[in-house]
Swiss-Prot record:
GO biological process terms held by the UniProt record: defense response to virus; regulation of defense response to virus; siRNA processing
Binding site for ATP: M85, D86, T87, G88, S89, G90, K91, T92
Domain of life: Eukaryota
Function as written in the Swiss-Prot or TrEMBL entry: Dicer-like endonuclease involved in cleaving double-stranded RNA in the RNA interference (RNAi) pathway. Produces 21 to 25 bp dsRNAs (siRNAs) which target the selective destruction of homologous RNAs leading to sequence-specific suppression of gene expression, called post-transcriptional gene silencing (PTGS). Part of a broad host defense response against viral infection and transposons.
Domain Dicer dsRNA-binding fold: 609-712
Protein name: Dicer-like protein 2
Organism expressing this protein natively: Pyricularia oryzae (strain 70-15 / ATCC MYA-4617 / FGSC 8958) (Rice blast fungus)
Amino acid sequence: MSSQDESASSSDTGEGGHVFGRENLNQSADYGYKTGSSASTHSTTDDAISEEPQPSGNGPRSIIARAYQLEMFQASMQQNIIVSMDTGSGKTQVAVLRIRAELERTPPEKRVWFLAPTVALCAQQYEVIRSQIKVANSIVMTGDDNVDSWSDVQTWDAVLANVRVVVCTYMILFEALSHAFVTMDSISLLVMDEAHNCTGKFPGRLIMKRFYMPRKSAGDHVPHILGLTASPVMKSDLSSMEDLESSLDSVCRGPTLQREELFANVHQPTMTVTTYKECDLRSPVQYTRNMNNLHLAFENLDIAEDPYVLHLMGQRTPKSLRELDRILTKLDTYTQNQMKALQRKSSSLFRELGQWAVDSYIYNVVEKVSNLDARSSWLGGWLDDEQRYLHRAIQGINALPVSAAIPAPEMTSIKLQVLLRILRGYEGSPVGIVFVKERATAGILSQLLAIIPDINARYKVGCMVGTSRYMSRKMNIHEVLQQGDDLLALEKFRSGAINLLVATSVLEEGIDVPVCNLVICFDMPANLKSFIQRRGRARMRESKLHLMIEEDSLVSVKDWGALEAAMKQRYENDMRELDHLAQVEEEDEMDVPPLHSRTTAAKVTVDDAKGHLEHFCRVVTRSQQYVDASPEYLVTTKTTAFVGGKPIPILGVTVLLPASLPPNLRQAHSSRDWISERNAKKDAALQAYKMLYEAGLINEHLLPIRESDFVDREVDGRPGLLEVQEQWNPWPCIVEAWETGLSSQTIHRRRLQLTDQDGMLMGELDALLPVPFPPISILKLYWIQHSEHPWTISFDPDVTMSGPGSTDPSFEIQQALDQTQILLDMAFGHRFSVSEQSKALRFIWPNRTLKLQMIGGQPFSKKAGEAHSSDYIIRSYGRDPYIYKSWVPVKPPLELVRGYWKAKPDEEEPPADAPWVVVKRLPKNCGFVKNSRIPIELPKEYQTSSPRRFDYIIPEQLCTFDTVPATLVQLGMLVPSITQAMEPYFVAQELLRRTALGSLDFKDIDLVMMVITSSSAGRLTNYERVEFLGDAVLKLGAAVTCATNNLHFPEGYLSLLKDRLVSNSRLCKAATALGLDQFIITRQYSLKQWRNMLTAPEPPTNTRKMSSKTLADVTEALIGAAYIEGGMSKALRCISLMIPNERWRSLDESRAVLYQVALNDIPLPSTLGPLEELLGYSFNKKSLLIEAITHASYNIPGSAGSSLERLEFLGDSVLDFVVVARLFSVKDPAPIEHYNMHLLRTAVVNGEFLGFLAMEWRTAATQRSVVVRTGQGTADELETVETPGLPLFGFLRHNASGDWVRDQQLAEERHAEMAPGIRDALEHGQRYPWDLLARLRISKVHSDVLEAVIGAVWVDSGSLEECEKLIERVGILRYLDRALRDGVKILHPKEELGRVAQNNKVVYKVDKAKRAARAEVYEVSGELAEGEDVEFLCSVTVGDRCVARVGGAVSKNDAMTKAALEVIRVWEEAGRSWDNVGVVLEEGV
């Protein structure tokens, strides 16, 4: 078992520790590490991941750990080590990797303690850890928290409850261990920052000596140790490193391999030593005016008046008298010491900076103290009288302000003038630090530099002197001016607002500052460690390090020159080593066979392989944020050989590919061992490329697979309109059946009953067909298009009236033909001949015989009209039909008549005094399946209130009437609609009979008829709703099939495959290949079409134009119909018929394959236990959950499994299907219309909404205790505070830094600010918050995590129901139900504006401008660079009017959305009218 395995085993037993230390040094350490390209993106801060800033760009930058960091991480997993790397090389990132690994492998009761020597460093490292490790609670404890007052174990237990990582100073842990508030067995890892301090009696060394070593000697558990330092040697004596190793039970380790990359990334500064002559200040004669006044005030102090002396004299005890004697001899009182310290500081400032500086300092101190209350808490005397006495002494200094606002050269020191020359002489854009020894010097020097004109023109100066351990510490008089905010200055330096920082040694160690190109040591470094730390701050290319040395210093220029010469010697040695490596590379013969394509002449050689492999990695990761695309190389030393008498390591290389690839394709090895590291990498790259080619990820041109490789040339690129077969017409076949073989035909009859809207029977007819009737039972028709209520035609069951063996069926058949012709002639004979139309669908009047003479066969008379009890038909000249209403004796006045019969020119006008008949005209078109939803206003004379109360009048002498009820004629007029209603059924039946779809055995012919009916047909139902369902079913089936059939394909390739399978072009081809095109119903009902229904088009006119989308939609609708009837299994059978060239698998089979390949026996890290509780689902294979929350940047060597992309690919389709199925299932109060289903689905599956939920959905809040300071002299109290739970996104495992951390911090800040408003809108609002979600600017990574978890649950459970429960819990379905219940407006504001604008053109104009006095904007585009203070403005024109202009937007999309909402608001306030809508300007725009 390896050391890692041993450690993991111990964690399983709850120990979580180790027993190895320095003695493991001689064990085999044959582990590799990975390296990225030397062109990788770099960080701009100390202890980040790398050194150099990446040029700004539009996309997110990606940063991963460099090879040497990963080498150190792996070494720390093997044994205790002290990581020794230069300042800024990324030691903290090594610690983050190590902490994360420790948390995952140890139980929750174990903690990691990160120790740092200073408060500022604790705060900085805590922020780094907190931002990168969110799965565990972490806290920071410093002296500022008054930890020394936590005097019982209950307080400590309460504070540390539920905490996994503690960041604190060394002293805090030492004291906690000393008092048994914390025990060693609760610590799994100790990280010791600035570990070089752990010598002598430093608390870090005492922790090891008193608590660690005894336990180790006894064989008890001890924590792992990880030290971090840039300078393990404090002095020139190398034995101090051995002492440090012994103290920390560790070995000092620095990167030993990858020399080529290390050299390429090390940027040492050019060092310059500058000497100066120090001012000789030996007597008061040389004092400045204010120094003399200070000296005089001090000399005038009478020790006998000192309050402390008077206090001792008043006690008159032996002890007080002895103390009084000592005080009088040494002048050692509080006031005397404060005045002496002020004099010393003044003298020091005079020597360092000159006359102007010291006079300004003394004057400002006096002014500051004089303005304080005599009993200010800043004055730290023992007695109140002492404070007042000191206050009076300071006020007695006759300090005068400086005479000049800007110091003249003669008023400054030679040393300051040297500094000014250095600053003035620097060329380029400076980013620098001036290191000084004393705090007072730092403050005054920064003020001086800030007022000197030519200096402040180039340098924005700040000051940092360090943060005190105790906030309540009393300040000395000489420190009262040092009240600047160190952290604020540091933040400004990091942000670029300050480019020159004057700092004390506090900035030498650890503090995260930008890389500099100018470092000036105003005072000589105290030791070698200090020199190395300061030098490490100058890490930009061509940076400068200036050492200012006093001529008479004990350390001579010669000594520093020797140091500089030694450094140059080191550079030269490094260059010689590079030359040697190049020579070795040339001698290392490259005899690796190239990669040849099997079908083309393409070839990749070993020299080409690295470039090709890098290109492949960029292609497969191009859609992934925060991911370094470079392949990473693990270099291992196999043995050692001697070349030219020099020992040379024999190397092997393993190349690691992105985590988005499956584990079996994540690494490849060099084919043999190599002397040259570069050649070994080339070999490994070629072997990896060969592996990818064999796996099918490289095409035959030896390039990464692209979209064009998936294109079916016969499918893709089809035009929008296609020429397809004419819609199949069933009626010619039916007529043929009537005309042939009647003796062998079975004649089918169904009785039709017409009832009005009240259910009253209006008439009956028997319909006959030589084929079975379609399964239609009820047909609802509107008499005219604007009828409010429909009439109902009900169909009795199909019965047989004749058939084989009948004696004389021809009589009834002929009778039906005759009666049908008469019936149709009654309805339409006055307009056209109906002889042909009567041959298809035939009718018989039950129990009656229709005769031609019944049509207008009787002349009209008043008596005849009154004899009929119901409506009947009146005809003029025996042809045009009307419904009889009444009789009038004379022609009514024309103003009372809506219409009347007019004689033709050759006809005689009937007399006005003759009788006239009042009738109602029959409509030209009737029998509509849908009524008009928009009421049409009738002409004035047809309105009910119109005085024209007579509809139409005809002279009585021209009228005849039918001897059949008017309802029979109306039934005849409905025959075309009845025929049209039957036609789709026949088409659907023929579809199933003639195509392979018949094998699916559809039971519901109504469903099939619906899904082949286009909306253009204008029928009551069409395919759109079912197509919406079928689309989701197809995409789910395609996603699952692609993932199962291509287990080694990354998500990008899977998306290309799926898109090819479900593309409209592919579905069009499937439809035409199946012969589906001629069965798609697109013809809209019309009387003209009914008249021509028996006319078959002749070639070449037997085709029609159809959009490719219609063909694709019907294909998906049939898939949806199959799902409705038989679930996913029948749907997949349907899909396999449509697209037969793919191996379609059932969901169960696919899930079984995917589950099988998921890694077994992977324990769930303890940090992820709360995640399972949040999800409400316990995984059978924990590896699936781990994969679902692993970002592609998680490039830790040895990490099992892949990243989340493939699961996210599956989860996206599962989520889409679950949402669509829920929408389709809604029936109350009515099914949701197709368009609204699209809107609702978009609302709940878009990335912004899902990302918001990934930040909202969180574990339960936890409670922990904090110590609350109640005030001086009062005991502190323990208060319980609630720590918010961790959101789903917070569990994401990643190894990104830099931009990732910044972007996520900004996202969290925006979420904290905007979440209440978004929650309110989602829970109570009547409009979907498109604008708020857009302004939140959540990255795609957030939604990817949620979808990946859904995919993982499906693969693990195989249950869509489990996924639906998860989707319900996260809040997606909950909001969907709420939006449906409350009628939330889902339409996007831009789309809504497009609708309400009607025929007016809407134009958006977006501009960008700098914004004044506001927080920084981080997301910008276009010509304004990232980080500039900009806002987006948008003006909207509707028609020819500028309606609104808004500003303050954070992106172009936000601006347009915001503007659209404003325009809608203005329009609504204007009464929903565009008339007189003025320009509305937002305030400040």
